[in-house]
A protein has these predicted regions:
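Intrinsically disordered, low-complexity linkers and terminal tails enriched in Ser/Thr/Pro/Gly
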Residues: 1-181, 185-190, 198, 245-248, ...
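Short, compositionally stereotyped local motifs that mark structural "simplifiers"
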Residues: 5, 124, 131-321, 326-329, ...
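Short consensus segments that form the blades of beta-propeller domains
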Residues: 17-22, 95-96, 236-238, 319-324, ...
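Short, solvent-exposed loop/turn and secondary-structure capping segments
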Residues: 18, 57, 81-84, 117-118, ...
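Middle-to-C-terminal accessory/interaction subdomains
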Residues: 138-140, 144-157, 274-278, 285-308, ...
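Conserved ATP-binding subdomain of kinase catalytic cores across diverse folds
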Residues: 280, 303-480
């Protein structure tokens, strides 16, 4: 065996091994030093072409005795100048070729002595071509063991499938302890009660299992540290617990699928009666393990410390890593607020979010895939309460963002609801209690995930026929720079000219764009525009409807608005010109697209009237406060419990009410935080109406528009609004007199539209534009029974 050998080759690396930055995806070649000496690899060559043995020449790298080193076939440029002097390099990047199978990988020393490996044309996903120390001349397709050479091959047993064990009672909610029996037609039953998957090393079932309230037992997963660099508060009190039984049947070389049931015994808190509960169970090592735990600082952070001597560094922890390589299998069980199990499914779980990954309570992305249970979509739609496989394959359990998770957790969801009838995509959400491996893990919002399946479900455009951008990043493998043509056109052309404005109207859905900007402005979200922006378009040529090829906007992550940052998102902040985090110190002038569009008179009128539509209806205090307090009442006990579990003594100096916070989080704290949002909703309309006139240089005055509505079944259109269900009462809004308002009437099936009576004057046309030349405009649709 030569001193330096090629010990492992990987030609497809979606989930096989990650590099020293925690990234999957690149092919790799592993080298192994079997000698007793340190070997300097300077001048050694590696290639996939026998006729060009020094395609890549190694430099300034040594390999210690018994050490394995990986050469990554990627384009990553690494600056090693900041590495600690004693750091032993185990990763070499930027090998300038890719492996696809069928080639011969050759390693050559400076004298031309070679070691070669002929790679098979095909290797199964998740497998590599490697040798063992016992047979270094014998390469086989095997499980990966990056940075380590196995002593022997381990052969997997190929097992037939037995029927899963039967439980004597179903999981669910029980007031008193219960006994759970299990039986199978053949074989031996093995089981676990801690969330771990069952193996032949698990406990053997030999009689009924008594399940009681486990809450008084010591915390296990809630007591694990190493989950955050910034805030690792762990609860000092015991947390609520349920019992997860996982069981399999084994008979010789046969095994059954895992049967999972969750038992909630003695948990009677009001928080469990108002909102649904989700149980997530998965291998503890997949959550908190050093190498592969997605909730942990883990190996990625350890390597970063070894390299640089620094523990901190954005992105350098297991929980920061993305992609399917950092997805772990889990069992999801969903219970209604009435404690009925509505569905269960094996799914994939990843950590979700940006900076919020640093928190002790992390968000989760949930994926339905046929590799887990044969389903490529969720088998139940919690938003419509419908069974059967649909098209949604991605959901998210959100904590509420990196700051809002420690307060009300409802700001984002609130504004998504308020804007849900507008021309922007909004995410439906359901507040849920979550248990993780049997321990209470706090309040989450189960939300739709901005993804290609979201666009398909809501707009009917297939994933292969759409381009989707989120946070200025193209999702999946779509056209690079797909939105650049819109921005370039806006920057280079004078959009005040009709022909140029008409052209950009063919590129973007103007109302969708307006509704996105107006919602972000009004909510006071400082983390918008350059960051939390989503948009999509169809790529089908010559289509109509949503297939017309125009860009449309998606709304997400409004967590830091509505007064959460007193100086940036308070009710009195002029969000048209200040408060934004991302360099747009004056968004209406510095945001390239909006600044170009607002120069056009038609766009300006449409924006102003649409904005006032939202002020008068969607975001009006009468409407928004009812929704807020309904949400607050439903989540009250759950949010307080969640904050007591995760918040500890944490305060935010940018949120002025925290000056009065004394832990633990209490009902008074919750009511205070809800009142901050309530005050924002009460005051925001007045401030933004005033800023609208000043910042957009309006010359007119505010006019009261009153629509007197008779009892007939009809709906009234006011600009972009459709007013329904206002029988027998008046609707009131305020608009600037700079622009007329547009009226229309849909009289319904049982009445006839006869015209309008406006300040005593009658008009016969249904669709009309009314100038606002009086301080009060009284409008009455004239209707007659058929």
């Amino acid at each position: 065996m030569p001193a330096i050998s090629i010990s492992e080759v990987c030609i497809s690396n979606k989930t096989t091994s990650y590099d020293d930055d925690g990234e999957y995806g690149s092919d790799y070649i592993e080298l192994y030093n079997s000698s007793n000496d340190v070997v300097d690899l300077s001048g050694w060559g590696v290639t996939d072409d026998k006729d060009c043995p020094y395609k890549y020449i190694l430099s300034s790298v040594t390999i210690n005795p018994g050490q394995a080193m990986i050469l990554w076939c990627d384009s990553k440029i690494v600056d090693t100048s900041e590495y600690e002097d004693d750091y032993i390099i185990q990763d070499v990047h930027a090998i300038p070729f890719r492996l696809s199978g069928g080639e011969t990988v050759v390693l050559s020393d400076p004298e031309g002595v070679q070691a070669a490996v002929a790679v098979p044309k095909t290797i199964s996903a998740g497998k590599v071509y490697s040798f063992t120390l016992s047979e270094p001349w014998h390469y086989m397709v095997n499980d990966p063991s990056p940075y380590y050479v196995e002593s022997f091959y381990t052969e997997e047993d190929i097992r037939c499938t037995l029927k899963e064990p039967e439980f004597s009672i179903e999981g669910g909610w029980y007031d008193e302890p219960v006994e759970v029996g299990m039986e199978s037609g053949e074989g031996t039953i093995y089981y676990t009660t801690n969330g771990e998957d069952t193996t032949p090393d698990s406990e053997i079932y030999d009689g009924p299992i008594l399940i009681s309230d486990r809450t008084d037992e010591p915390n296990v997963y809630s007591a694990i540290n190493g989950i955050s660099l910034d805030y690792e508060y762990l609860p000092t009190d015991i947390v609520d617990k349920c019992t997860i039984i996982k069981a399999i049947v084994i008979d010789g070389d046969k095994v059954s699928p895992i049967k999972t049931e969750t038992f909630f015994v003695g948990l009677k808190g009001e928080e469990y009666n108002k909102i649904p509960t989700i149980s997530l169970s998965m291998s503890p090592m997949d959550l908190f393990g050093f190498d592969d735990g997605i909730y942990a600082l883990g190996k990625v952070n350890s390597i970063h410390q070894d390299k640089t001597g620094h523990r901190h560094g954005y992105g350098y922890a297991n929980y920061y890593k993305r992609g399917i390589g950092w997805e772990r299998e889990a069992k999801l069980e969903y219970y209604s607020e009435e404690h009925k199990k509505l569905f269960e499914q094996n799914i994939g779980v990843r950590i979700h979010g940006g900076d919020s990954r640093e928190a002790n309570q992390k968000s989760f992305s949930l994926y339905a895939r046929n590799i887990y249970d044969g389903n490529n979509a969720f088998i139940y739609d919690p938003f419509t309460h419908s069974n059967g496989e649909g098209i949604c394959n991605k959901l998210v359990l959100r904590t509420g963002g990196e700051v809002e998770m420690y307060y009300t957790k409802l700001r984002d969801v609130l504004f998504q609801i308020l804007a849900s009838d507008r021309s922007i995509g909004t995410q439906r959400a359901i507040p849920c209690n979550v248990f993780l491996n049997g321990e209470y893990w706090g309040l989450y919002n189960l939300q739709e995930k901005v993804s290609e399946c979201y666009v398909q479900e809501h707009y009917g455009v297939m994933p292969n026929d759409q381009i989707l951008i989120k946070k200025n990043i193209l999702l999946d493998n779509n056209e690079a720079g797909a939105f650049d043509d819109v921005i370039d056109f806006a920057k280079m052309q004078d959009l005040s000219l009709r022909e140029n404005y008409d052209e950009i109207k063919n590129m973007v859905d103007i109302q969708s764009l307006i509704d996105y900007y107006a919602t972000e402005f009004y909510s006071g979200n400082p983390d918008s525009f350059a960051n939390n922006v989503g948009m999509w378009k169809s790529t089908l040529p010559g289509g109509d409807g949503y297939n017309d090829g125009r860009w449309r906007w998606l709304l997400f992550d409004l967590d830091e608005g509505a007064g959460l940052k007193t100086e940036e998102s308070g009710a009195d902040v002029d969000s048209f010109i200040e408060g934004n985090y991302w360099g747009e110190h004056c968004p209406i002038k510095d945001d390239a697209l909006f600044a170009a569009l607002i120069r056009n008179r038609e766009f300006k009128e449409r924006f102003i009237t649409s904005f006032m539509d939202l002020v008068n209806e969607n975001f009006s205090y009468d409407n928004a406060s009812v929704i807020l307090h309904d949400m607050a009442e439903a989540c009250k006990e759950a949010d307080i419990k969640s904050q007591q579990r995760f918040r500890g003594e944490l305060t935010d100096e940018a949120y002025y009410p925290d000056l009065e916070f004394i832990p633990p989080y209490s009902e008074e704290d919750y009511e205070r935080d809800i009142n901050v949002v309530d005050s924002f909703l009460r005051e925001r309309g007045g401030y933004m109406t005033k800023y609208l006139k000043r910042d957009f240089e309006l010359k007119g005055s505010l006019c009261d528009v009153i629509i007197v509505r008779p009892d007939e079944d009809a709906s009234i259109g006011v600009n972009t609004l459709t007013l329904e269900n206002i029988n027998g009462r008046a609707w009131k809004g305020r608009y600037y007199s700079d622009y007329p308002i547009e009226l229309s009437c849909n009289p319904g099936a049982n009445v006839l539209f006869k015209g309008w009576r406006i300040n005593g004057k009658e008009y016969a046309d249904n669709d009309i534009r009314i100038p606002l030349n009086n301080s009060i405009i009284i409008i009455e649709p004239m209707l007659q029974d058929k």
